Amino acid sequence: MKIALSGKSGCGNTTVSGMIAKHYGLEFINYTFHDIAREHNIPFSEFYEKEIIGRNDYYWDKYLDNRLSVLSRKNNTVLASRLAIWISKSADLKIYLYAKMEVRAERIMTREGGMYSDVLSSTFIRDENDKKRYLAIYNIDIDDYFSETDLVIDVTNINPNEVFELIRDEIDKRNLKKNS
């Protein structure tokens, strides 16, 4: 069984993907720019500004997405990333989590701290930067996810447990099983 889960920052991708992986005994794949920044001992905000936005060659995007593409070929995985539903072509179930920007900013603020207005602004800017980069690199419009997904869940007013239950119901309905 292969599950691919995408959504913008603050939608609960990591949390819900981890819950799915644990419940079904699947490998959880979630390698992000945060991980790369940690590996290089650089604060994420600095890494993002200098290495993601500050470069014109998209090196780190390609590095990250290539690594995720290779990992997505494995069986019995849950891949969580912004582009998971586009990267994991062979996923048995492709899920997109959606939430209003204000709710996502609130969640990010709770997780990372900061002032709401600053987090809201940086969330908007990050969304716009992500959209521009993915269009430039892959010709992917991350706001046009319906054609790539089997299931879209608006998580604006529901918690991770409720999201997990909706996904579990879909997995059970499709009779998806862990491969031996």
Curated annotation (Swiss-Prot):
GO molecular function, a single term: CMP kinase activity
Highest taxon listed in the record's lineage: Bacteria
BP term (GO), one: pyrimidine nucleotide metabolic process
Signal peptide residues on this chain, from the entry's feature table: none
Classification via InterPro entries: Cyt_kin_arch, Cytidylate_kinase_dom, P-loop_NTPase
Disulfide linkage: none
Class of enzymatic activity (EC top level): transferase
GO CC, one annotated term: cytoplasm
Catalytic reaction equation(s): CMP + ATP = CDP + ADP; dCMP + ATP = dCDP + ADP
Keyword Nucleotide-binding appears in the UniProt entry: yes
Binding of ATP, residues: 7-15
Enzyme Commission no: 2.7.4.25
Keywords: ATP-binding, Cytoplasm, Kinase, Nucleotide-binding, Transferase
The protein, known as: Cytidylate kinase 2
Gene: cmk2
